């Protein structure tokens, strides 16, 4: 199913994506998901060099077929469209852990040639970040941190993020 086929899909409060030509419908992201994505994106934007930009929910079309909406993206600054693979896509795990959904999307990012893929678990007690790097067409895990342990990577640019800060505003006091 080509990405353009999503155009007639109603705005029913669900996310509709085509990571490998198969329609995946999931509930709209909840507050923990959106807060973690927004704080992550802000941290990325503060750390990224001038020639790059970090942004939320790109709704990118990744080749033929395939449309996915990563939670955060880092790409080179250019015109109004993303015509080459971004340097980084980040996905926040849904509450149901959506593993089939993430496997489809991860495979789509691999095929599209996205060099860096991050996975965020917004668990309030022990949030975590995992980084994957594209090597010979497949992702290999390169970094992992949880809780208050700093997550450090050098690609696509040096950045340090403490996973617990992604959900700090969600914790009850």
Please place each PLM-identified region on the residue numbering:
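Gly/Pro/Ser/Thr-rich low-complexity, intrinsically disordered segments predominantly at protein N-termini
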Residues: 1-173
């Amino acid at each position: 199913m080509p990405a353009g086929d999503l155009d007639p899909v109603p705005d029913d409060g669900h996310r509709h994506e085509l990571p490998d030509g198969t329609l995946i419908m999931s509930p709209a992201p909840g507050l923990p998901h959106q807060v973690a994505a927004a704080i992550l994106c802000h941290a990325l934007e503060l750390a990224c060099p001038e020639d790059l930009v970090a942004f939320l929910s790109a709704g990118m079309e990744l080749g033929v077929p395939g449309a996915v909406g990563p939670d955060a993206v880092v790409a080179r600054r250019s015109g109004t469209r993303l015509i080459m693979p971004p340097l980084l896509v980040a996905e926040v795990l849904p509450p149901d852990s959506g593993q089939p959904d993430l496997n489809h999307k991860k495979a789509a990012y691999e095929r599209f040639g996205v060099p860096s893929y991050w996975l965020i678990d917004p668990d309030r007690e022990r949030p975590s970040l995992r980084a994957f790097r594209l090597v010979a067409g497949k992702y290999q895990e390169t970094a992992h941190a949880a809780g208050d342990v700093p997550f450090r990577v050098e690609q696509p640019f040096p950045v340090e993020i403490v996973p617990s800060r992604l959900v700090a505003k969600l914790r009850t006091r």
